[in-house]
């Protein structure tokens, strides 16, 4: 990762702290993964504070494939099976079947309907029967251990929510350029500056978590 481009955002620890503060305030963060991996940036919001306006931004400014990151135990509680039996995607992204709230939605595709679906899925005591399958929201199952186990946006999202003291569920979508191509680090930094959204990396989250473990040790 070209850390020099990220220098204006502070050190790795400072970038994570800025991201956690934004999430606690109900705002979003931009997280970029490794250059030798997807080399993409995702706009991420906490599921519990997600608004219709934020969902509209995910649909308008990003790829439109809005995903709900959930920990393994939540996926099991909602009885969400994998989207496919044999996952052959390059990075093993753990999509489950897509979902829709059974109550409170129309077609399910509008920003408001997708927020309703997400709130239904993350509700305390949510049951499998609360959700229809398929739908317009795409859950992703995070691996236990977070970014120390798998350096993906899914795990990074759950780690950030837990570090921020929020419910372990987050919503993400890949940032795209106006021409439909994937945004890379320079474009993501510009996007963050335009919308006043902090930028950090998966590597930053790894370093932050390792520093916490070192302090505990």
UniProtKB/Swiss-Prot annotation:
Binding site for Mg(2+) 2: 38, 153
Catalytic reaction list: D-ribulose 5-phosphate = (2S)-2-hydroxy-3-oxobutyl phosphate + formate + H(+)
Tagged with keyword Manganese: yes
Site description Essential for catalytic activity, residues in chain: 136, 174
Database matches in HAMAP family: RibB (MF_00180)
Residues that coordinate or bind Mg(2+) 1: 38
Function description: Catalyzes the conversion of D-ribulose 5-phosphate to formate and 3,4-dihydroxy-2-butanone 4-phosphate.
Gene name linked to the record: ribB
UniProt xrefs under PANTHER family: 3,4-DIHYDROXY-2-BUTANONE 4-PHOSPHATE SYNTHASE, GTP CYCLOHYDROLASE II-RELATED
UniProt keyword annotation of Cytoplasm present: no
Keywords: Lyase, Magnesium, Manganese, Metal-binding, Riboflavin biosynthesis
Pathway the protein acts in: Cofactor biosynthesis; riboflavin biosynthesis; 2-hydroxy-3-oxobutyl phosphate from D-ribulose 5-phosphate: step 1/1
Cofactor note: Binds 2 divalent metal cations per subunit. Magnesium or manganese.
Name of the molecule in the record: 3,4-dihydroxy-2-butanone 4-phosphate synthase
Organism: Shewanella putrefaciens (strain CN-32 / ATCC BAA-453)
Molecular-function annotations in GO: 3,4-dihydroxy-2-butanone-4-phosphate synthase activity; magnesium ion binding; manganese ion binding
GO biological process, alphabetically ordered: riboflavin biosynthetic process
Matching NCBIfam families: ribB (TIGR00506)
């Amino acid at each position: 990762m070209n850390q020099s481009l990220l220098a204006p955002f502070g050190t790795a620890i400072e970038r994570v702290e800025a991201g956690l503060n934004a999430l606690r305030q109900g705002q979003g963060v931009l997280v970029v993964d490794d250059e030798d991996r997807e080399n993409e940036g995702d706009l991420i919001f906490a599921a519990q504070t997600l608004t219709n306006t934020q969902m509209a931004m995910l649909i308008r400014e990003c790829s439109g494939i809005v995903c709900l990151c959930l920990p393994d135990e939540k996926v099991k509680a909602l009885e969400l099976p994998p989207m496919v039996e044999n996952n052959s995607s390059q990075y093993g992204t753990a999509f489950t079947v897509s979902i829709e709230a059974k109550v409170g939605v129309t077609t399910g595709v509008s920003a408001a309907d997708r927020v309703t679906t997400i709130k239904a899925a993350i509700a305390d005591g949510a049951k499998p029967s609360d959700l229809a399958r398929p739908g317009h929201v795409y859950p992703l199952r995070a691996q236990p251990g977070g970014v120390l186990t798998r350096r993906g946006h899914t795990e990074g999202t759950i780690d950030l929510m837990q570090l921020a003291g929020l419910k372990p569920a987050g919503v993400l979508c890949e940032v795209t350029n106006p021409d439909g191509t994937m945004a890379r680090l320079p474009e993501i930094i510009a996007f963050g500056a335009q919308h006043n959204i902090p930028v950090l990396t998966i590597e930053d989250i790894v370093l932050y978590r390792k520093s916490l473990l070192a302090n505990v040790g």
